[in-house]
């Protein structure tokens, strides 16, 4: 009986772990040894804490969720999540913002390929992303590997895109169209893989890291559209356009490569190995000084590492007897997640369905009074929308929106109210299509400015709802298994909302075509 009790005690994750053999025969000696060790640790805890803070500057001693954004960006772990957020959405926004180049330079505006390009690109991207997210969500492991693998896929896609920009004129339009769609599918799968992995990790780290990913995604929307807006003022020649787009795609490759480097340098999934010594499931006293200041992050990453080490053993054919049971234990049923997250995932779904009409209107509503060409005005609209999206994601961190009184149900209602913007978009499209050729149209500048304001506010509401929804996910869950599984589960609703929104966008293409005629 005594042996059993002592063994149970040893299994607990305590810091000073006695040898199991001594537990049966020398309990008094162990007690004295533990007291001496604790006394020694108290004498040196300050020194060890200082050394640890010098080694791990990425960990803030202050609660991260209470810090302003500029201070959060000094935290290496946070800025890594932020950078990967940029790498997540930059490729998508790069292709979306370059729609005018594809339609004008490759498909020559009037061809059937030019007319269906934007909607087809969104459909191929979102449907493939949805199917791949469903596949990933059922496999709740290898999250860190997914982050790296997805980013590598993006690097390959945009390297190929650079060569395609130079050689596309040698190929027929139909082949160019199908080849671009294939690259879009691979890119969307890479994005899905990275997002699935990083959101699973961010959910466990805390809502502030989820917000870091969201803000990074918004920055990824702003920067490519700013670049394209600047390129619109370059002399309109075939050589300058090709050179500008080539630089545009190369920049995307560079951005994603930086994300890979940062993820490796920050060692989000591996840095615990420098501070732990795990033997037979017991934590040794190497962390006595540092565990106090970094206990939560170490617990999180250590668990992720343990899962990935088990996966590595499986792939090398060295399965433990209980591996099968451990893998099954990791899987959280979707019914459990939906019961806890239904309002949040429905908010995400609704927001993206409504948002996907934005590119159709943005590329079909023309300037009427401002001294800009349509080739300059359309990138400006994309830029304003993305600036609004960024602002919405930043203000989601305000205390009033993180308060428990702003419930998931209120967030869902908020997402439904965005539908009211669609009739306004139709109205502006009708106004600008009837007056775009009339240089003396009264109040046309005001119409342009009002439309720009509408697009900015539409972007604000998109970023606001999405960021709040993802930040509230960890708060609704009870344990780390659920939080990790929620990364893939929420991505299903992201991709499903985008897929349905892209299909609905076809309807608005024909409605807009009817209005313009």
Swiss-Prot record:
Location relative to the cell: Membrane
Native organism: Saccharomyces cerevisiae (strain ATCC 204508 / S288c)
Transmembrane segments: 76-96, 116-136, 151-171, 174-194, 214-234, 243-263, 344-364, 367-387, 411-431, 446-466, 492-512
Note: Present with 217 molecules/cell in log phase SD medium.
Annotated GO CC locations: fungal-type vacuole membrane; plasma membrane
Species lineage: Eukaryota, Fungi, Dikarya, Ascomycota, Saccharomycotina
InterPro entries noted in UniProt: ENT1/ENT2 (IPR034764), Eqnu_transpt (IPR002259), MFS_trans_sf (IPR036259)
Function: Has broad nucleoside selectivity (uridine, adenosine and cytidine) and most likely functions to transport nucleosides across intracellular membranes.
Keywords: Membrane, Phosphoprotein, Transmembrane, Transmembrane helix, Transport
Record's bilayer topology term: Multi-pass membrane protein
Claim: ATP-binding is one of the keywords in the record: no
Tree of life domain: Eukaryota
GO molecular function annotations of the record: nicotinamide riboside transmembrane transporter activity; nucleobase transmembrane transporter activity; nucleoside transmembrane transporter activity
Region (Disordered): 1-63
Entry protein name: Nucleoside transporter FUN26
Pfam family, one: Nucleoside_tran
Bias kind Basic and acidic residues: ranges: 25-44
Residues recorded with modification Phosphoserine: 45, 58
Family the entry assigns: Belongs to the SLC29A/ENT transporter (TC 2.A.57) family.
GO biological process: nicotinamide riboside transport; nucleobase transport; nucleoside transport; transmembrane transport
């Amino acid at each position: 009986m005594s042996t059993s009790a002592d063994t149970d005690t040893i299994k607990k994750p305590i810091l000073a772990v006695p040898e199991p053999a001594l537990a049966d025969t020398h309990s008094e000696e162990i007690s004295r040894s533990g007291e001496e060790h604790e006394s020694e640790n108290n004498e040196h805890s300050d020194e060890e804490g200082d050394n640890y803070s010098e080694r791990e500057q990425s960990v803030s001693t202050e609660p991260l969720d209470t810090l302003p954004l500029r201070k959060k960006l000094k935290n290496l772990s946070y800025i890594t999540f932020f950078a990967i957020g940029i790498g997540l959405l930059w490729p998508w926004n790069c292709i979306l913002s370059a729609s005018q180049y594809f339609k004008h330079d490759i498909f020559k505006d009037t061809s059937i390929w030019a007319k269906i390009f934007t909607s087809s690109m969104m459909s191929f991207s979102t449907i493939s992303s949805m199917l791949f997210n469903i596949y990933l969500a059922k496999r709740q492991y290898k999250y860190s590997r997914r982050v790296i693998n997805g980013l590598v896929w993006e690097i390959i896609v945009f390297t190929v895109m650079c060569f395609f920009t130079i050689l596309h004129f040698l190929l027929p339009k139909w082949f160019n169209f199908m080849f671009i769609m294939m690259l879009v599918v691979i890119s969307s799968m890479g994005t899905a893989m990275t997002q699935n992995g990083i959101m699973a990790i961010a959910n466990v780290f805390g809502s502030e890291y989820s917000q870091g990913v969201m803000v990074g995604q918004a920055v990824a929307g702003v920067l490519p559209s700013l670049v394209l807006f600047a390129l619109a003022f370059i002399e309109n020649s075939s050589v300058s356009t090709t050179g500008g787009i080539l630089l545009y795609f190369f920049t995307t490759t560079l951005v994603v490569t930086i994300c890979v480097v940062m993820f490796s340098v920050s060692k989000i999934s591996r840095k615990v190995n420098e501070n732990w010594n795990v033997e037979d499931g017991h934590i040794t006293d190497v962390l006595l000084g540092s565990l106090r200041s970094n206990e939560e992050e170490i617990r999180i990453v250590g668990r992720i590492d343990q899962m990935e080490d088990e996966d590595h053993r499986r792939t090398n054919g060295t399965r433990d007897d209980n591996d099968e049971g451990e893998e099954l234990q990791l899987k959280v049923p979707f019914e459990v997640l939906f019961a806890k997250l239904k309002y949040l995932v429905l908010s995400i779904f609704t927001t993206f369905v409504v948002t996907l009409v934005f590119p159709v209107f943005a590329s079909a509503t023309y300037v009427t009074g401002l001294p800009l060409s349509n080739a300059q005005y359309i990138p400006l609209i994309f830029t304003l929308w993305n600036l609004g999206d960024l602002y919405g994601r930043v203000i989601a961190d305000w205390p009033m929106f993180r308060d428990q009184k702003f419930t998931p149900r209120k967030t869902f209602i908020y997402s439904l109210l965005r539908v009211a913007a669609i009739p306004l978009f139709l109205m502006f499209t009708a106004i600008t299509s009837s007056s775009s050729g009339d240089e003396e149209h009264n109040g046309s500048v005001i119409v342009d400015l009002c439309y720009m304001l509408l697009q900015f506010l539409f972007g604000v509401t998109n970023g606001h709802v999405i960021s709040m929804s993802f930040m509230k996910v960890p708060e609704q869950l009870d344990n780390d298994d659920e939080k990790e599984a929620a990364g893939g589960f929420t991505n299903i609703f992201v991709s499903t909302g985008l897929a349905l929104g892209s299909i609905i966008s076809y309807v608005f293409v024909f409605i807009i075509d009817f209005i313009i005629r």
